[in-house]
Amino acid sequence: MAKDVFAVPIFFICFRECVETSIIVSVLLSFIKQTLGQEQDATTRKRLIRQVWWGVAIGLFISVCIGAGMIGAFYGYGKDHFASTEDLWEGIFSLIASVIITIMGAALLRVTKLQEKWRVKLAQALEAKPLTGGTFKNNLKLWAEKYAMFLLPFITVLREGLEAVVFIGGVSLSFPATAFPLPVFTGILAGVAIGYLLYRGGNQASLQIFLIISTCILYLVAAGLFSRGVWYLENNTWNHVIGGDAAETGAGPGSYDIRQSVWHVNCCSPLVNGGGGWGIFNAILGWTNSATYGSVLSYNLYWIAVIVWFVAMRHKERHGRLPVVDPLLNRLRGRKSAEPGNGEQDVEVSTIPSDLQTESKIPKSGASLV
């Protein structure tokens, strides 16, 4: 029977998780190639690309190792013992990934205006800097700057890999072991193919068009991740209320908390039987058939926060200051400098780095974010 050879839910699970990972990785690789395209940047470009692939490889290795133990436990105990914490770490990882992607998207849009400066920054990020002797916060900041292209693919692959393993483990008991290899291979292959097409398209398009399109895609993914993260945390609370995994009841009554529900449809679930096409919408856009107040509000608040952030950046580039934030910060700094014993810190606080001063003097004609 076809069911004994090819498990359709497994295919959609692998395809869904691989598509989201491929989008992030392809955008990063295209960004590196577009930004460091000159011959003199070949060494820096290779090292940054190596960081991306190391992040993918290590994230995949860790998720496979953890997944092997989890799948073994699924078959050994005949029960999903990890469902009680699945939604918790799903929510945490989704929120972290959303914040990282949001920051990365804003940085991408500034490349066309400050492309040469970005080349210098990327090169400086790879310089050997001492990570000892300073405070833990400074050391952590230096480490994050040096391995920025490693962190995002690492977290993304780790999160998507563990998510795929948990979902596969949840449906594995209804399929024989022979039904796993082919759908896993074809699902990953299809996801990689989509990522490759995005990468090729990003390289052939002009830099400005590529940055606009890729940033829009990244923010759609980040908004969906933020909403999904809140939804997972709420679902984790509901699982504790009912004393089990709500997903095991399907998509009908009992699978959601009606007190927190904004809408619910018994079809179109991204979690039941691999999700099918709805699982793809869930991975890229954050679709859910059972929306809660938290997931809907968080999705809208995310976009409001992003809009306010971009308007503030636009205003600061044009006028060199923020109307409310900068006076408040100056007042706080003034109070701090008035305290006894802070004389040496006054110079340090009031000193503005030269690169920030240069940015604030950019002509208004080139002040657009793109």
Curated annotation (Swiss-Prot):
Main location: membrane
Bilayer-crossing regions: 5-25, 52-72, 88-108, 148-168, 179-199, 206-226, 293-313
Phenotype upon loss of function: Does not affect the virulence in a murine model of invasive aspergillosis. Displays an 8-fold increase in external siderophore triacetylfusarinine C (TAFC) production after 12h of growth in iron-depleted conditions.
Keyword Iron annotated: yes
InterPro entries (UniProt xref): FTR1/Fip1/EfeU (IPR004923)
Record membrane topology: Multi-pass membrane protein
Chain segments carrying region Disordered: 335-370
Family to which this protein belongs: Belongs to the oxidase-dependent Fe transporter (OFeT) (TC 9.A.10.1) family.
Protein name: High affinity iron permease ftrA
Taxonomic source organism: Aspergillus fumigatus (strain ATCC MYA-4609 / CBS 101355 / FGSC A1100 / Af293) (Neosartorya fumigata)
